Amino acid sequence: MENMGAFQFRGVQLDLARQMETLDFIYEFIDFIGKSGYNTLVLYLEGRIKTKSFPYPVAGEYYTPEEMKAVVSYASKKNIDVIPVVSVLGHAELFLKHKEMKHLAEIRGDAKSTLEETINHVFCPSLPETFDFIKNYLSEIAAIFPSKYFHVGCDEVWDFGCCSICRDRIHNGESHGDIFAKYITDMHGFIKNELGKDMIVWDDLFECYPNALAKIPNDVILCCWNYDRRVDLPKAHFKSRLEEDLLAKYEKLGFKYIFAPSTFLVANIESFTTYSSKYSPLGGLLTVWEKSLNFMYEVMPLVHYAGRLWSGKDINFNDAIKDVFGCGDNIFFDALRSNYEIKATHPTRLSPLSYLAGPITEFEAIIKSSSETNSDIFSLFLERCINDNARNMLEDILVSLEWKKIMFKLRTVVEELYSFDEKCPDIARRKYITSEMAEMIDRYLKKKLDQWKRFRKGISSAGIEKTFTEFRNKVLELAETSAKAAGVLKVKFFLPDMYNAQKCKFTIVFEDGSTEIAAEGIFKNYEMNDAYFIYKFPYYTTRQPVSVRIESWLYGGLGIAYLEIISRKSCFYPVSICNVKGNVQSIQHILVNDLRFCYLGETDMNALLQMPELTKRKHGLTLVLGERQEE
């Protein structure tokens, strides 16, 4: 990459809201980022600090003000500024999970969640009590962090304009964007005038409410996040992926801004940095998210690379990585780069039936082969690492690759369990292969818990134990449940945008008029690289299916290219369509097994954001089935 010089703001974020880290690790991380060229640590806290105004967190789920002051003091000695992030609108679940706080939630009384969220995560922006609490809490947090900056979040606010007070404001002429702009403006006035700090916000809600941007003070600092593989021109996250030159727009309106890539992909960091360097950002913020099932060590090589890149010192990935590990060659460097690509495009699945997705795809085969090769390469270098910290990083990567082995094994095992041909296993075989999988998961969990004891000593590991133990038990249950399945509903989906959140329900109707819901949920491609993907949904009614009813609602729409039912004796395929309702486009395509697709739902994202009631509208059709006897 071309050397673009040092950015003024060189930050990295540590997500302590989703997973607490020990103070010792935070100190270690500060040492690491200081050597990597960063001058700012952003602590994503939400409601992680217990204070007088927020005394509800119980032991083991909070930091004290004194602990955070110690972190700030330590960082200051390393010339690292520490900025807190307290979510004052969305992502407020750490606050709103407490019964004493529920009266401040947007979803209260008769209010309904826009995207059918099961937890309260949004403060009501219309309640004076909300602002009173937030002012008190932010004042306490500001006293801990002397930084000139204060980050208030405000991203991904799904339940907005839902409560009776907000609805009345909209009925009386305000728009969702007006309500958002007023809230941001009021928050800015408090932070600027009473706390004496510059306010930072995430920028994605301004995609949803573009008119709000011109209504807020332009000394609000916008944090522009984008996690696409290549950021040649940013695409909106929640508005039909509208392409827009956001940084040019922000400069034209006089805003200061920070660009924020993620540790998901090397290419994301590099391309977003290149794009941003054409303009005049304050700098970059590398965002690290949600490490409750993983550890920070795995991403620390990328943290180092971004820090060197932004400080204008190292512009070569290989040199930066060799600096971390004290060893390596081109094979090692290429393996590490590809490993981050694999991690981003093949995330963890924690539902056994999500592995029932047809034959392994060409892309999965490439990932499987690359993962196995990378594991062999990293194992060779483990003992050559320059220090314990480097070994922890490589070990963490190797343990994650073990999970990849489990995932690919599950892909073949679950397909075998739900096969309905001559390969269909007997109950003894079913119990054997599920027990074998359970043993693999047990060994993996033991390694994760051993890591936990070393990396997060004193912090409860109940979450990770519960998650993987429940997953293991569900895998064991497949031996019995798969044997009872009468067949599977196989659906070929088309989803052009991974940010869509369109719910879909498939109901099978049988010859006697009885029904069974085969599946209901939001379905996405776990590979994250192809708009087309397959899922198979088991059903258990032994009577002959005659039709499938499809219903779809919520956000963004969903395409269905084809579906069929495969039972123990027959195959059933769509022959005609009836009972169409709502917005269903290109209906006839669903009758032919090719790459054309029928699309259900609203495609106008802007309309959905401005009128959330549209997300409740049902779109659907019924497919009448014909029977094709298996030879």
Q: What residue spans do the PLM features occupy?
A:
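Surface-exposed loop/edge segments in extracytoplasmic proteins
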Residues: G513-E520, S570-P574
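Extracellular carbohydrate recognition and processing domains
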Residues: E516-Y540, G582-S586, L591
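Substrate-binding groove of N-acetylhexosamine-processing glycoside hydrolases
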Residues: D31, A70-S73, P128-S139, A143, ...
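Short, surface-exposed beta-strand/strand-loop-strand elements in extracellular ectodomains
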Residues: Q502-G513, A561-I566
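Feature activates predominantly on carbohydrate-active enzymes
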Residues: M1-E194, I200
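Mature N-terminal, pre-catalytic/accessory segment of carbohydrate-active enzymes
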Residues: M1-E46, Y62-Y63, K148, N387-F493, ...
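Noncatalytic modules at the cell exterior or secretory-pathway interfaces
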Residues: A485-V491, Y540-E551
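Short beta-strand-plus-loop segments that form exposed binding edges in beta-rich domains
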Residues: F493-D497, R549-G556
